Amino acid sequence: MCTSIRHDWQLPEVLELFNLPFNDLILNAHLIHRKFFNSNEIQIAGLLNIKTGGCPENCKYCSQSAHYKTQLKKEDLLNIETIKEAIKKAKVNGIDRFCFAAAWRQIRDRDIEYICNIISLIKSENLESCASLGMVTLEQAKKLKTAGLDFYNHNIDTSRDFYYNVTTTRSYDDRLSSLNNISEAEINICSGGILGLGESIEDRAKMLLTLANLKKHPKSVPINRLVPIKGTPFENNPKISNIDFIRTIAVARILMPESYVRLAAGRESMSHEMQALCLFAGANSLFYGEKLLTTPNADCNDDKNLLSKLGVKTKQAVFFDS
């Protein structure tokens, strides 16, 4: 199995990985993971929604879209003091990276100062900072970099071919343009996708291929399992199988050996055994907290119990004491 860093993957190669016998695939992914990371250490990330609901985009999976009746109450931007308290709590809980997100289409210039203030608060606690704020221009990205932003999250969700089955208010090229702006501003990219949208295995392969063939691999690759939301067009989508989800984790690890592969949304429905296999297959980051934006997340005490049983350490030892 090749362990070099590549940006020239071809679709037949990626499909071949997806079609490997399961044990061979996850073993190869695990061996690559061990070469680039401590396989018994995991990154813990926290996530705060600074603006909830009312998003003008029509992403068919999202509870925050204004296009659907999801019973979600629209909320204004959080005040800085509330955010400051959340950051301090995250620090006490042993979080490594503090991420914040807003339900809007793109960053507005009038909000730059507010966003930069949040970044400064995060950095003052010696935490990594990550923002997920929609489309971003190069000029805006440079301002966020100057403020100290470490990561910017902008998921591509799925393959280019399947994309318009998911969202029509923003193009695939819009997403790639924002990723390019983030990279040019020398901010680390955080970008991944969602499984269970109705996509094929080839779509999953193409999504990972797009990320792996960027000029710089994303430093973080969140892999989400669809959490069906009542009132959205995808509320009745069938659940992706555990095996297929783990396969995708493994292929992501093989294609992007130096990236953090994050278990993101949907983890609350995963057994300890499934999560253990995901970690073996190369996942080495997870979101911690009882809520991810508007959807439930795994129980905090349950996470500590799982990692303790597996002998997996976190970067911050205080995590197990909080």
Curated annotation (Swiss-Prot):
What are the entry keywords? 2Fe-2S, 4Fe-4S, Biotin biosynthesis, Iron, Iron-sulfur, Metal-binding, S-adenosyl-L-methionine, Transferase
- UniProt cofactor(s): [4Fe-4S] cluster; [2Fe-2S] cluster
- Pfam families named among the record's database cross-references: BATS (PF06968), Radical_SAM (PF04055)
Pathway per the UniProt entry? Cofactor biosynthesis; biotin biosynthesis; biotin from 7,8-diaminononanoate: step 2/2
> Binding positions for [4Fe-4S] cluster?
55, 59, 62
> So which residues are the signal peptide here?
none
Domain Radical SAM core span(s) in chain numbering: 40-258
One of its GO biological process terms is: biotin biosynthetic process
Which Gene Ontology MF annotations are present? 2 iron, 2 sulfur cluster binding; 4 iron, 4 sulfur cluster binding; biotin synthase activity; iron ion binding
Indicate the quaternary assembly: Homodimer.
Record-given protein name: Biotin synthase
What gene makes this protein? bioB
